[in-house]
Amino acid sequence: MIKFKCTIYFFFILTAISNAGENFRNIEIKGKLTCIISNGVPSHDIGRFPNSANPNSFKKQKLNFCFPTIPQLTEKVTWGLMTVGVSISGIPIRPYTAEYFDSNGKRGYSRNPASGWRKQAMYLPRSLGIDQHNGHVDKSGLYHYHSVSKNKVPQRSDLLIGYAPDGFKIFYNPNKATSSWRLRSGTRTAPPGGFYSGEFEQDFEYRVQSGSLDECN
């Protein structure tokens, strides 16, 4: 489970493509900001890209993620961010996809958000060419994570895996943290129709205090 606070401050991502190489990550303090600078190369082997479900080739990047050194909570929740965090190795965390249900689109999806039903990356991860670390490559060659790969991280409590845009730490704690987002029951009342299966983000609803985490976790 990815754990992050509700209030998103800001997240600068400066990117330019360069040649592939070894992992590089540096942390710098710039005034009131902490910046994680990386070349976009993970600290582990990645899957084969391109592959049958992902036509994109991996490319080394120049990434600069900056966030408040001292995070502050506010009363406002910010929605709609694609990048919700950066790993401690300097790789973006992007749980969402850019694909929506579209009866006229290829394989029933397109980048047109008109339907309001956004595809969940981890419902059928291999359909997006996601590798064993739950990451893949976008059109720019940027490798990013869609989820924590529980089989690839140490199984201990309160494992720091990264930082959110507001500066709060992101922990992986599967034994203590439980989500308050639940799969809806019944069937969808609008296209795409069918049972709530978890294929789309909108298949889930937030149920207050049904788990230990709030709506932003």
What are these model-derived regions, one by one?
Residues 1-8:
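Bacterial N-terminal signal peptides that target proteins for export
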Residues 11-19:
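Hydrophobic h-region of N-terminal signal peptides that target proteins for export
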Residues 20-124:
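Solvent-exposed N-terminal domain segments of exported/luminal and surface proteins
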